[in-house]
């Protein structure tokens, strides 16, 4: 409702249902996106902006003064992704959804609270207050003792303290192993 009053709308990627675009609703929208997650093209630093025609020249001036350009390799890969990769994207979504569901269940079994289940991307922001009030120290201890990297919630601002972020952008086998290690670490006396 607050977004409607300000004539704003937010649409995000989801695992279920048809993908939507703000451009279905208006031609006065700005769409900023990249190829990293959707097409698994991390590191190529390729993105795009769709904007109203009336804003294009100003945006071109801004772009020309802030960025050099995407490499020709990244540009060609992006073109190929747009033309051919949709079946692969759908398969990846199914794989990520399987990993997401598995990780959510395991984290809850271990005692982490997940207040909002992720619907896109490949991260879970879990409440770790049961284990710590210092997410930085907790993430460091998990790395040192379980040899698994997680991100302290405080890295996302003070409101993230007591939370940690897990990634499921790895194989299910490695996710299982990592969660097994964390589980063993948490069940040790004094952890």
PLM-predicted stretches and their roles:
Residues 40, 53-58, 87-88, 131-132:
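Short helix-loop capping/hinge motifs at secondary-structure junctions, enriched
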Residues 79, 94-104, 115-128, 160:
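Conserved glycine-rich beta-strand-loop-beta hairpin in the small C-terminal domain of fold type I
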Residues 59-63, 81-105:
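Structural signature of PLP-dependent enzymes
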Residues 23-24, 46-53, 83:
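Short beta-strand-to-turn element immediately C-terminal to the catalytic PLP-Schiff-base lysine
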Residues 12-41, 53-54:
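Active-site pre-lysine segment of PLP-dependent enzymes
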Residues 1-7, 11:
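Single conserved hydrophobic/aromatic residue that forms the stacking wall/gate
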Residues 132-134, 141-151, 156-191:
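PLP-dependent enzyme catalytic core of the Aspartate aminotransferase-like
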């Amino acid at each position: 409702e607050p977004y409607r009053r300000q004539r704003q709308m937010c649409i995000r990627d989801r695992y279920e249902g048809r993908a939507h675009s703000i451009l279905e609703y208006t031609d006065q929208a700005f769409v900023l996106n990249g190829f990293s997650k959707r097409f698994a093209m991390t590191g190529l630093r390729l993105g795009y902006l769709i904007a109203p025609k009336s804003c294009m020249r100003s945006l071109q001036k801004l772009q020309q003064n802030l960025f050099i350009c995407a490499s020709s390799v990244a540009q060609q890969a992006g073109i190929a992704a747009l033309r051919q990769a949709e079946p692969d994207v759908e398969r990846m979504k199914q794989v990520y959804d399987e990993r997401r569901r598995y990780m959510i269940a395991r984290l809850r079994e271990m005692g982490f609270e997940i207040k909002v289940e992720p619907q896109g991307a490949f991260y879970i922001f879990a409440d770790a207050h049961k284990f710590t009030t210092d997410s930085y120290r907790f993430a460091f201890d998990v790395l040192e003792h379980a040899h698994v990297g997680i991100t302290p919630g405080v890295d996302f601002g003070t409101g993230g303290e007591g939370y940690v972020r897990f990634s499921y952008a790895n194989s299910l086998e490695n996710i299982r192993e990592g969660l097994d290690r964390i589980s063993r670490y948490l069940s040790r006396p004094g952890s």
